[in-house]
Amino acid sequence: MSSETSSESTGHRPVLLVFADSLSYFGPTGGLPADDPRIWPNIVGEQLGWDVELIGRIGWTCRDVWWAATQDPRSWAALPRAGAVVFATSGMDSLPSPLPTALREMIRYVRPPWLRRWVRDGYGWVQPRLSPIARSALPPHVTVEYLEMTRNAIDFNRPGIPVVASLPSVHIAETYGRAHHGREPTVRAITAWAEEHHVPLVDLKAAVADEVFGGRGNPDGIHWSFEAHRAVAELMLKGLAEAGVTQRDSAT
């Protein structure tokens, strides 16, 4: 990461730097390109008059955000121009994981292919049955440790840059047995961390619960409708304003 001059002093449009899981770029029928105007990061960017750098992947936790912020050269390039940073993760952290995350993520590397398919199918059978009693993918204290490591590293390179974090979304996914008992402990841990470090929070549940629980999202029961994306964008703009970001309309 770099501590070079910010966009305000170079004449470039500021960048909204978003670290995210798939909730930020999936719609009601599947994944979308990072520049799709219907997903919340681009709705927010349009309202602010900013560019957007969306760095994410399906299944990412707050631990992956740390790795992306410190190892992905896109984040190094975006940070000097960033007007604000959003941590749009924590949902995967709070979902049940019958296998330890490291083992689950190694399934993709199993060889030969027939064995990988067998292991994946087996895990797909086990996951919804064991999810109601499984631990979260990341313990809440580990989630906030990675959030703080990332926030501190970003603040070291860009002192005082506005940062907004997120509380977990909700789901009705049969693949997880509709279980989400890890959400409340994760919410409590992130809330305490955010209060300590004065980080505004966006409660994704508040934005999307009606759509998700009403069955109006993606059929997988996890990802959102475009109406939910618009609701997230609205709350994200409020969180950014709380962090000190001025919207384009209010600045004129």
From Swiss-Prot:
Belongs to the OctT acyltransferase family. Gene3D superfamilies: SGNH hydrolase. Keywords: Acyltransferase, Transferase. This is Diglucosylglycerate octanoyltransferase. The keyword Zinc-finger does not apply. GO terms for molecular function: diglucosylglycerate octanoyltransferase activity. Coiled coil: none annotated. It comes from the Bacteria. Signal peptide: none annotated. Sugar octanoyltransferase likely involved in the biosynthesis of mycobacterial methylglucose lipopolysaccharide (MGLP). Catalyzes the transfer of an octanoyl group from octanoyl-CoA to the C6 OH of the second glucose in diglucosylglycerate (DGG). DGG is the preferred acceptor, but to a lesser extent, GG (glucosylglycerate) can also be used as substrate. DGG and GG are the two earliest intermediates in MGLP biosynthesis. The gene is octT. SUPFAM superfamilies: SGNH hydrolase (SSF52266). Its EC number is 2.3.1.273. InterPro entries: OctT, SGNH_hydro_sf. It catalyses: (2R)-2-O-[alpha-D-glucopyranosyl-(1->6)-alpha-D-glucopyranosyl]-glycerate + octanoyl-CoA = (2R)-2-O-[6-O-octanoyl-alpha-D-glucopyranosyl-(1->6)-alpha-D-glucopyranosyl]-glycerate + CoA. Homotetramer. It comes from Mycolicibacterium smegmatis (strain ATCC 700084 / mc(2)155) (Mycobacterium smegmatis).
